[in-house]
A protein has these predicted regions:
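Conserved ATP-binding N-box helix of the HATPase_c
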Residues: 72-95
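Conserved short strand/loop->alpha-helix "switch" segment adjacent to the catalytic nucleotide/phosphoryl-transfer site
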Residues: 32, 58-79
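Glycine-rich/acidic phosphate-handling loop/turn and adjacent ATP-lid/helix
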Residues: 110-141
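Short beta-to-alpha transition helix within the HATPase_c
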Residues: 17-24, 36-53
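Short beta-strand/loop element within the Bergerat-fold HATPase_c
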Residues: 96-108
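Glycine-rich nucleotide-binding loop
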Residues: 120, 163-170
Length: 175
C-alpha cells in the first residue's frame, strides 16, 4: 500500500528508496538469471535465491525473453505457482532436492518446463489435481488451474507427468 501511494503521488524517487530499503539483504545475487524481461527476472531471481537458501539445487536454462507477448500478470501466475510448487515439493523431499527449469523462446514458440524431485504422486479429485497442502483444502489445485487457464488463453498446450520421485510440468505457447 505504501508503494502504491508513493507511485500515485508521483513520488518515484521515494518509492525506489523505500523498495531498496525493505529489500536490502533480501537476496545476495540479484541478477543470477537474466532474460531481458524485468518481471520474469524478478520472479526467477527471487525463487532462485529461495531455493538456494533451502539447499535445493536450481538448474536453469533461459534465453532472451524481451519480446515475449504475454501479460505480466499471466507470467507472474505461471512462474510463481510452478516455482512455489516445485520448491515446496523439494522441501518435503527426502534425498536429493533438485529443480530443473527452462524458459525459452525458440522456433516461434514459448517453451517453459519445470521438473523437480518429489516424494509422492499427484492426487486427483474429480479428474482435477488436488492440493496436498493442509491449509484450506477448499482450494484444491487452484494454482495449477490458474496456470492451465492462462495456457489455454494463449492457445498453448501443457503436459503434466509424475512418478514417485519426479514431477514435470511443460508448457508450449505459439508466438
Amino acid at each position: 500500500m505504501c508503494i502504491e501511494a508513493l507511485l500515485k503521488d508521483k513520488e518515484y524517487d521515494r518509492a525506489v528508496d523505500y523498495v531498496s530499503k525493505i529489500s536490502k539483504g533480501f537476496f545476495k545475487e540479484r541478477n543470477a538469471i537474466n532474460t531481458n524481461q524485468v518481471v520474469v527476472n524478478a520472479i526467477l531471481n527471487t525463487k532462485y535465491e529461495e531455493a538456494i537458501n533451502k539447499h535445493i539445487v536450481f538448474v536453469f536454462k533461459v534465453n532472451d525473453l524481451s519480446n515475449i507477448k504475454m501479460e505480466d500478470e499471466d507470467l507472474v501466475v505461471i512462474l510463481a505457482n510452478l516455482l512455489n510448487n516445485a520448491i515446496e515439493a523439494c522441501e518435503n523431499c527426502i534425498g536429493k532436492k533438485v529443480i530443473k527449469f527452462k524458459f525459452m523462446m525458440e522456433e516461434q514458440m514459448i517453451i517453459l518446463s519445470v521438473k523437480n524431485t518429489c516424494n509422492q504422486m499427484i492426487i486427483y479429485h474429480n479428474n482435477e489435481i488436488a492440493t496436498t497442502k493442509m491449509i484450506n483444502q477448499d482450494e484444491n489445485g487452484v494454482g495449477i488451474k490458474n496456470i492451465i487457464r492462462i495456457v489455454e488463453k494463449y492457445n498453448g498446450e501443457y503436459v503434466i507427468q509424475n512418478d514417485e520421485d519426479q514431477f514435470y510440468f511443460s508448457i508450449i505457447i505459439p508466438l
